[in-house]
Amino acid sequence: MEQNELKILAQNLANPQGEKGIEIGEMMNETNLGMTLESIKALSVEDGNHILEIGHGNGRHVENLLARAENLRYIGIDISETMHIEAEKNNTKFQDKAEFVLYEGEILPFEDKTFDKIFTVNTVYFWKNPVNFLNGIYRILKDNGTFVLTFGQRNFMEKLPFTPYNFKLYNNDEMEQLISESHFKRMKISEKEEEIKSKTGEEFIKRKYTVLTINK
């Protein structure tokens, strides 16, 4: 890929827009599905839970989540208007259980202690003020709630050709340090590895990633 194409890819991974964004959203759903399902598993969803996902993409995984327990209520938020529209389109049959909210990326527009479970996959690289954002998540999570944060490890991510463009990368120690600066203190680290098709579409690669299960 040419440098300009890599920049466009990086921009659309952060905030998918238009027809290219829809294409990237489909690709992200496919390549991130393993990480997403591991994150959902780590949530240990229970009947009646109110769940928030930060950065829902095209939302094709929501059906899987809603099937895991009874009377779940899911809200997904995203900065991408394109993904917001696609997620609503892909989940019309779950309108009574799933809601999608467009937001500006920094202030989480919810009341204190709203959610039992919160999760996010591959978004932390784009947070402008990570500690403030973590504290915002802490604020809207109920006492004894669970927050799952999943990210590609630095030593894997830095080999990808598009991550030099506006990606902030972390290894496990750096992420632990970041979280320790927030109100969150209790966490469990689980390292994973999977083989996926690269986002440039040119090869299959082994991705190393971390699922952090953080309790309030």
Per-range role (PLM):
Residues 117-130:
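A short SAM/SAH-binding and catalytic strip from SAM-dependent methyltransferases
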Residues 30-47:
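Conserved alpha-helix/loop element of class I SAM-dependent methyltransferases that forms part
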Residues 145-151:
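Conserved beta-strand signature within the Rossmann-like core of class I S-adenosyl-L-methionine
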Residues 131-143:
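A short glycine-rich, Lys/Arg-flanked "PGG" loop and its adjoining helix->strand segment in the class I
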Residues 106-117:
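A short acidic, Gly/Pro-enriched loop at the edge of an enzyme's catalytic core
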Residues 50-107:
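Class I SAM-dependent methyltransferase SAM/SAH-binding core
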Residues 158-174:
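Acceptor-substrate binding/catalytic loop of class I
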